[in-house]
Amino acid sequence: MQIFVKTLTGKTITLEVESSDTIDNVKSKIQDKEGIPPDQQRLIFAGKQLEDGRTLSDYNIQKESTLHLVLRLRGGMQIFVKTLTGKTITLEVESSDTIDNVKSKIQDKEGIPPDQQRLIFAGKQLEDGRTLSDYNIQKESTLHLVLRLRGGMQIFVKTLTGKTITLEVESSDTIDNVKSKIQDKEGIPPDQQRLIFAGKQLEDGRTLSDYNIQKESTLHLVLRLRGGF
């Protein structure tokens, strides 16, 4: 079948492939046509970076699909990931790698599924779709890996305007953490947020489990007047 590869310069390359071809094979074909070494190629499809050992059919890439080709910065960089057991893992990454990519690399090395990984840097939990450069993570930075309780849970936050926000949380998350997640989604600073559950205002240092907030519970968000009490 034919697929297309679009470069950052806007050029489109046509390739003859089989669904059973690996991403490595595709990179070799691109090298044959364009002279770009495979180790400098990153291929993206449906927003996801494609891994060398996988096949086109693994990613549901069908005839006339378009892949995007991004060139790697020469050589990338090393970062460290420290686990709760004190073990330190070294990873080869690019600043343009997403947190998803980093979790996949940790899975390759340690066998921990990405959905059980939480990565922390500078006290902040890192979100999957963001890149290392978004968080200003540079060479030889150290991330901390915390394992999620199985799968976490969803809760809802209802604002006074009637809008409902869905959040991914753990029962062990503090009210501060929840307010940070609301800030990430809605841009409201935590110090302007008051969260109410079961008629009770929630205190920052307490956890969701302290208040018996379970999956699919609904919290109410009230905005503090600036300078109020």
From Swiss-Prot:
This is Polyubiquitin. One of its GO terms (molecular function) is ubiquitin protein ligase binding. Disruption phenotype: Confers pleiotropic effects like an increased sensitivity to mild heat shock, increased formation of colony morphology variants and induction of hyphal and pseudohypal development. Induces cell cycle defects, as well as sensitivity to thermal, oxidative and cell wall stresses. Rapidly lose viability under starvation conditions. Residues 229 form a propeptide. Residues 1-76, 77-152, 153-228 form the Ubiquitin-like domain. The gene is UBI4. Keywords: Cytoplasm, Isopeptide bond, Nucleus, Ubl conjugation. There is a cross-link at G76 (Glycyl lysine isopeptide (Gly-Lys) (interchain with K-? in acceptor proteins)). It comes from the Eukaryota. Its main location: cytoplasm. Ubiquitin exists either covalently attached to another protein, or free (unanchored). When covalently bound, it is conjugated to target proteins via an isopeptide bond either as a monomer (monoubiquitin), a polymer linked via different Lys residues of the ubiquitin (polyubiquitin chains) or a linear polymer linked via the initiator Met of the ubiquitin (linear polyubiquitin chains). Belongs to the ubiquitin family. One of its GO terms (cellular component) is plasma membrane. GO terms for biological process: cell morphogenesis; cellular response to heat; cellular response to stress; filamentous growth; filamentous growth of a population of unicellular organisms; modification-dependent protein catabolic process; phenotypic switching; protein ubiquitination. It comes from Candida albicans (strain SC5314 / ATCC MYA-2876). It is found in: Cytoplasm; Nucleus.
